[in-house]
């Protein structure tokens, strides 16, 4: 593709020291994602999928190579600048949603906007519009404990998208849901990635979800292989 990548990594590697030995988890990874592209990463438990996601999201430091997000090399940024870039250009969705239990659905979705110093009235308006878009306009004032598993994951997706990031990373987004609810979340993700032109990078064991992506990559023995 000629369009500039929203995310790329070059010769990415990660290893850990265990006594006198160095254990290589990831080695020589190359990856590019472009606006609106949907990519799944699959692999066995312990293959390094979550480690890779943490490296690509700037939550961990590679042993080798570089990661570029929205045109910025993550390793060249200080911690504060890296945090600002993540809040602006990147959204995260986890298997267990990680919503703040003491806040309502609306307040949870407002949070990234408020961190970015968006005025409260504007933040509430944007968060409300996105919650309505994911089918939760009637649940704005409900706290996570009052929502179903599928509803909580919809709130998490809305929170990830509220800053209109170029990329959303999802770590097993349907892994804790029944098949019917998981299909609804999959359909929602596909619709939003198309309509908002957001790139989605999904780590999953769910091959049904993976097959709906534009590309599927298998993480095996520290390397990414196209399926």
Curated annotation (Swiss-Prot):
Protein name: Lipoprotein-releasing system ATP-binding protein LolD
GO MF annotation list: ATP binding; ATP hydrolysis activity; transmembrane transporter activity
Subunit structure: The complex is composed of two ATP-binding proteins (LolD) and two transmembrane proteins (LolC and LolE).
Encoding gene, per UniProt annotation: lolD
Domain ABC transporter: 7-227
GO BP, sorted A to Z: lipoprotein localization to outer membrane; protein localization to outer membrane
Disulfide bonds: none
Subcellular compartments: Cell inner membrane
Top enzyme category: translocase
Native species: Pseudomonas fluorescens (strain ATCC BAA-477 / NRRL B-23932 / Pf-5)
Cellular component aspect of the GO annotation: plasma membrane
EC number: 7.6.2.-
Topology in membrane: Peripheral membrane protein
């Amino acid at each position: 593709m000629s369009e500039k990548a929203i995310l790329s990594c070059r010769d990415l590697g990660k290893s850990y020291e265990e006594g006198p030995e160095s254990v290589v988890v990831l080695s020589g990874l190359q990856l590019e994602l472009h606006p609106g592209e949907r990519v799944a990463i699959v692999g066995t438990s312990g293959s390094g999928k979550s480690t890779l996601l943490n490296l690509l999201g700037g939550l961990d430091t590679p042993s080798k190579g570089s990661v570029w997000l929205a045109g910025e090399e993550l390793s060249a940024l200080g911690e504060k600048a890296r945090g600002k870039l993540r809040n602006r250009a990147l959204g995260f969705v986890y298997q267990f949603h990680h919503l703040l239990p003491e806040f309502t659905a609306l307040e949870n979705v407002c949070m990234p906007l408020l961190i970015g110093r968006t005025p409260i009235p504007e933040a509430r308006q944007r968060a409300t519009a996105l919650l309505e878009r994911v089918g939760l306009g009637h649940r704005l004032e409900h706290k996570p404990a009052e929502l179903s598993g599928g509803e909580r994951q919809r709130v998490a997706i809305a929170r990830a998208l509220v800053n209109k990031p170029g990329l959303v990373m999802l770590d097993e987004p349907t892994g804790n849901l029944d098949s019917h609810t998981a299909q609804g979340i999959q359909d929602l993700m596909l619709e939003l990635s198309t309509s908002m032109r957001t790139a989605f990078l999904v780590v999953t064991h769910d091959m049904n979800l993976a097959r709906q992506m534009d590309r599927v990559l298998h993480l095996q023995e520290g390397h990414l292989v196209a399926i």
